[in-house]
From Swiss-Prot:
Function of the protein: Catalyzes the conversion of dethiobiotin (DTB) to biotin by the insertion of a sulfur atom into dethiobiotin via a radical-based mechanism.
Positions annotated to bind [4Fe-4S] cluster: C55, C59, C62
Catalytic activity: (4R,5S)-dethiobiotin + (sulfur carrier)-SH + 2 reduced [2Fe-2S]-[ferredoxin] + 2 S-adenosyl-L-methionine = (sulfur carrier)-H + biotin + 2 5'-deoxyadenosine + 2 L-methionine + 2 oxidized [2Fe-2S]-[ferredoxin]
Residues annotated for [2Fe-2S] cluster binding in this entry: C99, C130, C190, R262
Gene Ontology process terms (BP): biotin biosynthetic process
Protein name: Biotin synthase
Family, as annotated: Belongs to the radical SAM superfamily. Biotin synthase family.
Superkingdom: Bacteria
Gene behind this protein: bioB
Organism listed in the record: Xanthomonas axonopodis pv. citri (strain 306)
EC annotation from Swiss-Prot or TrEMBL: 2.8.1.6
InterPro entries xref list: Aldolase_TIM, BATS_dom, Biotin_synth/BioAB, Biotin_synthase, Elp3/MiaA/NifB-like_rSAM, rSAM
Cofactor: how and how many bound: Binds 1 [4Fe-4S] cluster. The cluster is coordinated with 3 cysteines and an exchangeable S-adenosyl-L-methionine.
Known pathway: Cofactor biosynthesis; biotin biosynthesis; biotin from 7,8-diaminononanoate: step 2/2
Keywords assigned: 2Fe-2S, 4Fe-4S, Biotin biosynthesis, Iron, Iron-sulfur, Metal-binding, S-adenosyl-L-methionine, Transferase
């Protein structure tokens, strides 16, 4: 199947995809997926909160916002040795990428060298590195790149026209500016959003439209299902129809055919059957481990059993930590010939 990488999607086109009969949408998404990836391989990441709680923002979904009574207390930035120990455990459990998250609006200058040390140590273990630290300026993005960071996560969260219903302390343009800084220094981007926050299908289309018309598609697109935490304003929101969630995955795959589409937060309450539909629809990345920052995630044994039932295997990567001209060069051990073989 010939797939053209596009950045000129319009709302009507994405609406038409969402409106397709469910079997037809999954067929199209699976065909696009097979054109670029081995459908039996799933990239596995582990996420660690290296600085928890005390965030001054007001994101309505977030238990780490200090203004909400969620039982999450503010903690100091972890020591590098603690982070390395967690990364070692993640690698032993099968993760190929280690993501470090901090509950900051944006990092202070004194924090960047500490995070850079974490990145260097984790990279030396042969893991891909990812960080999500809030808003970055150009200099901070460069410092993280120079430390060997591979990916920076900064989500758009939702559609531009629904954003003010969720967040008031940061503008949509602030998020776009951070993504621009990250791209400009050559970091790979991890950028997606959250569904099930009371938005309409039109808002979900708006989120995908914003992502698919960025100057460069995100390398990873996490699709999160809202995890409702008592004490946050969104606790008690009506649950999203599971088939609508699968449609979100499928349209993301079609609109951004070469991106990794990550089945992200919310998996703990998803059935194996729902997750299988998501993999069929084009999801090819997950967070692996019992916790995502402060919320639950399926334990590793459950994921291993699911992979075995579905015949899936973790995508293997090799990281060249000694590459000086291009620190953090990553080679996924997945070949175009393998992808074509499964597409045949």
């Amino acid at each position: 199947m010939s797939v053209v990488l596009r950045h000129d999607w319009d709302r009507k086109e994405l609406q038409a995809l969402f409106d397709l009969p469910f079997p037809e949408l999954l067929h199209r998404a699976a065909s696009v997926h097979r054109a670029h990836f081995d459908p039996a391989q799933v990239q596995v990441s582990t996420l660690l909160s290296v600085k928890t709680g005390g965030c001054p923002e007001d994101c309505a979904y977030c238990p780490q916002a200090q203004r909400y009574d969620t039982g999450v207390s503010a903690q100091k930035l972890m020591e590098t040795e603690e982070v390395v120990a967690k990364a070692r455990q993640a690698k032993a459990a099968g993760a190929s990428r280690f993501c470090m998250g901090a509950a900051w609006r944006s990092p202070k200058e004194r924090d960047i060298p500490k995070v850079a040390a974490m990145i260097r140590e984790v990279k030396a273990m042969g893991l891909e590195t990812c960080a999500t630290l809030g808003m970055l300026d150009a200099g901070q993005a460069r410092a993280l790149k120079d430390a060997g960071l591979d990916y920076y996560n900064h989500n758009l969260d939702t559609a531009p026209d629904y954003y003010d219903s969720i967040i008031h302390t940061r503008q949509y343009q602030d998020r776009l500016n951070t993504l621009e800084h990250v791209r400009d220094v050559g970091l790979k981007t991890c950028c997606g959003g959250i569904v099930g926050m009371g938005e309409t299908r039109e808002h979900r289309i708006g989120l995908l439209l914003a992502l698919a018309t960025l100057p460069a598609h995100p390398d990873s697109v996490p699709i999160n299902q809202l995890v409702q935490v008592p004490g946050t304003p969104l606790h008690g929101t009506q649950q999203l129809d599971p088939f609508e969630f699968v449609r979100m995955i499928a349209v993301a795959r079609i609109a951004m055919p070469k991106s990794m589409v990550r089945l992200s937060a919310g998996r703990e309450t998803m059935s194996d059957e729902l997750q299988a539909l998501c993999f069929l629809a084009g999801a090819n990345s997950i967070f692996y481990g019992e916790k995502l920052l402060t919320t639950g995630n399926p334990d590793t044994e459950r994921d291993q059993a699911l992979f075995q039932r579905l015949g899936l295997r973790p995508m293997q990567v090799t990281v060249d930590a000694a590459e000086h001209d291009h620190p953090g060069t990553v080679h996924a051990e997945i070949t175009r010939s393998a992808a074509c073989e499964h597409a045949a």
